[in-house]
Amino acid sequence: MTECGITGIPLYMDADAALFHTLGLRSVPSLAVFDSQGQLLRATADMPNADEMAQLLDAAQHPAQQTLAFLKQLIQADGAIPSTYTLSGGAVHPGDTVLSETMGQTMLYAAQTEDAALFSDAWCYVRDKMTVGGLTVWRIQAGEKAAANASLDDLRILRALMEADAVWGGYEREIRERAAALYAACVVDDALVSFANVDGSGRGDRVTLCYLDVETMRALSAYDVRWTAVANRSEAILTDSRALMSSELPLYRASYTPAKDMFSNAAAQMTEAALTILHAAQISAAGEQTLDWLDAQLGAGAIYAQYASNGQVGYGFRYEAIGSYAVLAQVGAVSGHTELARLSLAKLENRRVATGTFAGAYGSVKGETSYTFDELEALFALMAMKP
């Protein structure tokens, strides 16, 4: 072991081979690496060399730092973080699309970790390249701005600005102006609709449930009291008995149309459903029925990418979305469902690239398109799981 650089940390022999069999290992010697909380990070029969061992230990001891270092490789000279990338040929290849979602996630994580340089880079890009009339266009693709915003992304950017203002000061005017712009564009009868055209030519008529970040709305009410009513209506939508698909599938429905007082019956996209559950959990409104269902699915082995309204896995969606596990780890941490948090984090960490050029990434090393959403939500999950 010392030849692999393993010194100064606890080593344990699996004397009765219980762990060997539990993890499904097939050869001797094998190695299992755990973090300080006993979370399994890696189990392998390929014994690492000294450099690989150092990266494995770094993943165990400083997982967020490793992932953040990878993420910073994607940052462009103007502060943009592409929403997709591929890993191939020993290099990271960024995509040509920037989402307000990704930029808002970056701003929020930077504010919460007091990373002033990262926050400044992301905020300057949002302010200078993505903002039109106080709203943030949801996408810039190959340099071309989208015509509309996404109200959740504007809420997330506002949350990041509020947290930055609490740490460094100097953002109150921006918060007030952007909160007023979002209210004027996207609030109808106290309901936050999903989007508005940034030129003022129209808006959506549906409320996307995963956009209902009530906690942020309540924080915004300190700057603009009108957001109190929006928060109250949003909480009422989330707690409406019709918001869950069924007792057999207690996931939140995708959307609600206020004019028709009707919830949609569309299939549940798991990452969106997980975000809705997280927002509900943050205000202690996530039902035990929903949390127990998640526990049961994870206990049975997996939570899949989509579920039809009848509770069956959607055709072509019997795969696991890594971003949903990152969000569900946060749900477990916020709601006190420790087993949900633990199992979700285990699923997440099983996808971590722990060694090599791409250490810290959660994407595919086979050249497939990967999403920075996953790395960013993983960073929030790791923060939420800190003892």
Where in the sequence are the language-model features?
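C-terminal structured domain segments
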Residues: 316-320, 326-368
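Internal amphipathic alpha-helical repeat/solenoid segments
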Residues: 67, 71-105, 110-113, 118, ...
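Extended ligand-binding clefts on enzyme/binding-domain cores
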Residues: 64-68, 73, 93-101, 135-137, ...
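Short glycine/serine- and small hydrophobic-enriched flexible loop segments
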Residues: 107-114, 156-167, 215-219, 278-282, ...
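Terminal, non-catalytic domain-edge segments
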Residues: 65-66, 273, 279-285, 334, ...
